[in-house]
């Protein structure tokens, strides 16, 4: 064993050895096996790891390594979410085929992951852009199609009029311009493919109750995204006789509806618009088409709209009310039309005030809730300062007058629904904010949709025997002209599998979220080329026991994965309801960030590399002093830390220890070079402790076989000295605390703090030749193994340990060792600390007082005086009051 810790030398050595012996290979599950499936959200192969990756994967790796040492059969795989726009853009910008660019990046990132010492089963590696994977993605599409869950319809898309192509929402900036051409983006209607996720809305919502191992924040985000609303569907009739359906959560306020508002995209707009209003309506529709749904539905945005020229009849009171269109009403939610009750809805109130529409109050607030002006305005509440949305009683509402406002039994909403159903004017309905999933992408680098369009047979699914539908390689990518696949006539033209006529392939590719919505299932049987996975294997390994990833995936990826799992359950492919039992959303990694408050935009951020004096930072261009904050690492801020540099200088174990020690996993982590250095010093200290122990014992060979015998059960507790008992207590306290930190809330930071305490206790014990010291050294190395796997392996071998440290059993603590023989008693005089002394653990209060009186501290500070009062806190404190 070398006297000096050299992480680069030992880490590469052990990584090669682990690969050679298949240390991380997933074992076959046997009857009675305890399984544990640990999974990090797999990355997009951008080419370089960032510190966010390092944190995510290190967290999961510690969990996986700990579970293996506990005797679990562990599945801990890795793969690549490899389709997507960046590869296509790289092909356009650099003239590199997307596949070549992607696989180069995968090779580079795989090497980086291996250098971190991550215990992945690389034999199960999957790549979503590989035909042997996307064959099964296409097969899943066919299962959705057969189940009626995949369909095609016209839908609005972002259209770049310069590049003549469809843009994803992320490619449209805040001003509504294309990221590439700068052109104002238009909304166009194109035929698009959808997955009917709304068919599972009720299950997705109800089963959130099963996810007790998920953060409450994530469950709430999903609940809000699904957005269940209980209310009523009510039919209004226009004066022309057309039916206009609305969904409302407040049917009790129908008597206060003074106008209606339709979405600009509502199919009845054309029919209801009069000739006099046609030009104004057309202009307004064009304006609305240029705005995103987020912009349109912003609460603080000024309301806009235009009258159609038509009227509807309020079914509950036969009043004639005007029909408007406004972009704050979205076609995708409810029916695309609303009844407007301005006295009791703030958006409707602002709209009515702007356009001079009537405001009628139908809820009487509790006494004292309204201003005198509002009370005086009475029924025609044109002078209200804001909509009243609180409690009260119904007024001006016919059969509901006097009923208390609320959604509970016997309250206004329930009574209104019952009355509407009895009158045949409406019915109870449950609506969801969730919309069907638009999966079409007019892109090349994605999974082809396995559908053929036949002029005679219509939409024909590709036969399963013909899967996969391969992406053509001879494609020219320009970023212009719509779908690149549509330009390849030789690929597009195909015979209809049903009738044999000339037909055309679908040229859209699938949303990449589809590839990531089932990858965790494939890992259970990753090399199966006959079926997507064997049912017995997926049921044995799934659900995932611990899933780790960023909060940014709280909604879409996690919701889609839950949806896929439920569909595949209903198709008989698996037998569980939810894919992930426990979820950990790690915090961001933040870097020291410099900015000039006198500059704006991107120019205000000054890259850390340009700051010469971090203690007194100045702008290298202007000399102005810079402000310093911690912000999420990003290229734009120039505040990132390259993992490669950290590995080269300190090694993987130091990087892992810092990442785990600096902050609890769910909190943001502030990168600090001084703390990295601190972890490096700690590992050096442990190295020296083991080195000195081995040298003192005559070298590794003299210890071979002996270290494994120095187990707690072998220690003769009765013959131990006080120093040995104290050290043994520290050893078993460390085992207990580290085990609990790894088992419960993954408080890795406090677990590492316990390792430091144990190292300190070993250094201070002064009994290097004791068997208890040997037990402590052995325990320290075992406890370190999940956190710093390379140094733990090297030290374990130096101690003469058999096999790999990662194949050892996790140590268990001896409860008897935690019980102290003595207790420390604090001495106070008039409430001030004056000293302490050791007393037997079984000391009585009377004995404690007498021992305190005879102590050196009491003799010094009492100066012979007799205390007026003595306060004894058993086994803790004696306070002498003079």
Curated annotation (Swiss-Prot):
Broad class of enzyme this protein falls into: ligase
InterPro entries per record: aa-tRNA-synth_I_CS (IPR001412), aa-tRNA-synth_Ia (IPR002300), Leu-tRNA-ligase (IPR002302), Leu_tRNA-synth_edit (IPR025709), M/V/L/I-tRNA-synth_anticd-bd (IPR013155), Methionyl/Leucyl_tRNA_Synth (IPR015413), Rossmann-like_a/b/a_fold (IPR014729), tRNAsynth_Ia_anticodon-bd (IPR009080)
Molecular function via GO: aminoacyl-tRNA deacylase activity; ATP binding; leucine-tRNA ligase activity
Gene that specifies this protein: leuS
Main location (coarse class): cytoplasm
GO cellular-component term (any): cytosol
Catalytic activity, reaction form: tRNA(Leu) + L-leucine + ATP = L-leucyl-tRNA(Leu) + AMP + diphosphate
Binding site for ATP: 635
One BP term from GO: leucyl-tRNA aminoacylation
Originating organism: Synechococcus sp. (strain JA-2-3B'a(2-13)) (Cyanobacteria bacterium Yellowstone B-Prime)
Descriptive protein name: Leucine--tRNA ligase
